[in-house]
């Protein structure tokens, strides 16, 4: 096993904790911290060269840690921290290059062991974190799968890695397939499907009418137990742009927010996207997390 450190991405949960920690550690000027209310902490994420704004609740001059906000996949409720990811795509002052290939949907060449035709449709997007989305149906899934269905199947994991390698090459993140082995953090790979009833890992029933679509995502070679915060940014951004696979799974059309179903429950995420001179841009993506 080769050990390596990757500086290629970000973590949404750690971004949430960073704002609260900055206040605890005295990194935020005391004059900016209300006795009761919300403290706005601007975070510079050096890995991705982006600004993240954390809205941290304050009670009696201290970071509020308890509350009734429940983040599915995290044990026990806590205080709600709202995160704003400013200009979450890779480049540009007014929204950036969202789609590295210039396409809302690409035809990826993949091994026949992945799909018999050797071609798989994918949306390749850089927002929050470089992410590739494919249709669950195209790879033989429902979109309701839990971790055990995939993480205990070595062949399934190998198929997903083959898809991820193809996406990384097309996005320009790697030049040779073998480089993907030392770039496990990015791109993320997720599969989407229209909303349908399912049960979460804890047995909770999610009704199709409660969500806009289903999303399952892999991180570091395994299906995630819930949803990564950075991938949620990519989901919200892609959903806001008509024609992406995420948008189509959600029913198509223009939308500023979606609630999607993941293995542990649901999550709502929003994004502000617009088309300028024929190019889609996104100025902000917003979601709530807890710092537990």
Task: Please place each PLM-identified region on the residue numbering.
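DPxDG-like acidic metal-binding loop motif
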Residues: 13-27, 231, 236-237
């Amino acid at each position: 096993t080769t050990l390596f450190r990757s500086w290629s991405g970000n973590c949404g949960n750690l971004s949430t904790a960073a704002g609260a920690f900055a206040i605890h550690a005295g990194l935020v000027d005391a004059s900016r911290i209300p006795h009761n209310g919300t403290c706005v902490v601007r975070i510079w994420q050096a890995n991705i060269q982006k600004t993240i704004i954390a809205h941290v609740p304050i009670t009696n001059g201290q970071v509020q840690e308890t509350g009734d906000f429940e983040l599915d996949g995290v044990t026990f409720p806590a205080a709600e921290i709202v995160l704003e990811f400013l200009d979450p795509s890779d480049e540009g002052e007014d929204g950036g290059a969202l789609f590295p290939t210039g396409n809302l949907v690409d035809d990826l060449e993949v091994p026949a062991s992945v799909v018999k035709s050797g071609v798989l449709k994918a949306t390749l997007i850089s927002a929050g974190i470089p992410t590739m989305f494919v249709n669950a149906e195209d790879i033989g899934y429902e979109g309701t799968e839990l971790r055990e269905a995939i993480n205990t199947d070595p062949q399934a994991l190998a198929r997903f890695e083959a898809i991820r390698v193809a996406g990384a090459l097309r996005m320009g993140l790697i030049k040779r397939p073998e480089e993907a082995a030392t770039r496990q953090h990015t791109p993320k790979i997720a599969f989407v499907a229209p909303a349908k009833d399912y049960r979460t890992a804890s047995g909770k029933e999610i009704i199709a009418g409660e969500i806009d679509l289903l999303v399952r995502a892999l991180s570091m070679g395994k299906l995630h137990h819930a949803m990564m915060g950075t991938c949620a940014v990519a989901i919200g951004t892609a959903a806001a742009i008509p024609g992406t696979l995420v948008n189509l799974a959600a029913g198509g059309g223009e939308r500023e927010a979606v609630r999607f179903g993941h293995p542990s429950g649901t999550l709502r995420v929003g994004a502000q996207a617009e088309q300028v001179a024929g190019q889609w841009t996104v100025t902000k993506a917003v979601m709530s997390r807890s710092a537990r």
